[in-house]
From Swiss-Prot:
The keyword Cell membrane does not apply. UreD, UreF and UreG form a complex that acts as a GTP-hydrolysis-dependent molecular chaperone, activating the urease apoprotein by helping to assemble the nickel containing metallocenter of UreC. The UreE protein probably delivers the nickel. It is found in: Cytoplasm. It comes from the Bacteria. This is Urease accessory protein UreD. Required for maturation of urease via the functional incorporation of the urease nickel metallocenter. One of its GO terms (molecular function) is nickel cation binding. Belongs to the UreD family. InterPro entries: UreD (IPR002669). The gene is ureD. One of its GO terms (cellular component) is cytoplasm.
Amino acid sequence: MTVLTHPFTPHWQAELELGYTRIGDATRPVLRRHSGPLRVQKHLYPEGSEVCQHIIVHPPGGIAGGDRLDISVTLGPGAWAQLTSPGAAKWYRAASPAFQDLQLRVEAGATLEWLPQETIVYSAAQAELNTRIELHGDARLFYWDIVALGRPAAGERFDAGHFQARLDIRRDDRLIWHERQRIAGADALLDSPIGLDGRSVFATLIASGELDADLLERCRGLPSRVRGDLTQLPGLIVARCLADEALHTRAWLIDLWRLLRPALLGREAVPPRIWST
């Protein structure tokens, strides 16, 4: 009999609340409150004062059963924040669920780039994620999410536990995107052609705006080692992919970001230095 345990025996209850305001031509972090092991490093301005970059860190290094992470981010009118992470978020095997609640609020004229590195869900983990994004007026969003199930390189398939995620995006209180996923360990969808088709990594990119046909085709023609595509919806671009490795997935998303950021946000893509460490 296998007992599901992990050395991180305390149940972490962590909260992080961030707020940004535009002052003149600069975006300034005006709220940074945390409790438990969730925090941000010093704010950075690699592109100048208009774009404030923060790296969200979770010092325990992983999320175990009973843990709860609550993250709330608010951008005031005209602010621009870019949020990323220093490495993969790891959800460990556990006998009880662990939770993450993410709330992102972007006021008119503001821009949020949510660009974390991948989420690795170990076999027998019970990961439950809920994300709510509120856009107001002409607020702009560039969001992605990468999920890796199991650890194939270590010979570990996702054969127990579950991954559950919900994503709601609203603009001016009107629902413009709703998605709900639940994948159980050893689920037939893991290998089904209408599911993950034997791949262990999947990702979604959602950006606000409209693309012209030429740029859409350029994005679709990017060389990559993933199976992916883009769709233009009213006011949203949605990209999805399946892959065997998170590294390939991340490379594809970054290539898309390099093409899309100038067109949608009016700035050339400057990759965060943390991605290269």
